[in-house]
């Protein structure tokens, strides 16, 4: 088996020849948020939003757009290295997150709905992880 970091894995964009069997998350002090939006308990996700804040640095990942999960790099740039996020900065970051990635429509959800979900849950997630 081989190990790789998350950024390298996400850069593969579905070009995998192996099966992902493990995810290793090193323990560190920080706050995190995860939301899986689905229609029923057993459904595949319509959208996934994951946010972590460690030492003033934020990581924002969006999955099930439907596509391979991606880091929201512009969103991360807009909030990183700030002591405390203002309400306006959170709203701006949520807007950036909804705009910087592409979304597609499927039977489960439209692209517009996914985009709206990302905006709402990035806002909620940033509010949650930036609490003191």
What is the role of each PLM region?
Residues 1-132:
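C-terminal structural segment of proteins
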């Amino acid at each position: 088996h081989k190990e790789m970091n998350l950024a390298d894995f996400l850069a593969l964009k579905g070009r995998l020849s192996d099966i992902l069997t493990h995810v290793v998350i090193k323990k560190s002090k920080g706050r995190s948020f995860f939301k899986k939006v689905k229609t029923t308990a057993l459904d595949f996700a319509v959208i996934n939003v994951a946010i972590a804040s460690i030492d003033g640095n934020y990581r924002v990942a969006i999955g099930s757009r439907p596509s391979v999960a991606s880091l929201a790099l512009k969103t991360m740039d807009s909030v990183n290295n700030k002591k405390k996020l203002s309400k306006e900065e959170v709203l701006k970051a949520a807007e950036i997150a909804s705009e910087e990635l592409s979304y597609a429509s499927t039977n489960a959800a439209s692209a517009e709905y996914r985009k709206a979900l990302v905006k709402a849950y990035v806002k909620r997630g940033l509010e949650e992880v930036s609490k003191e």
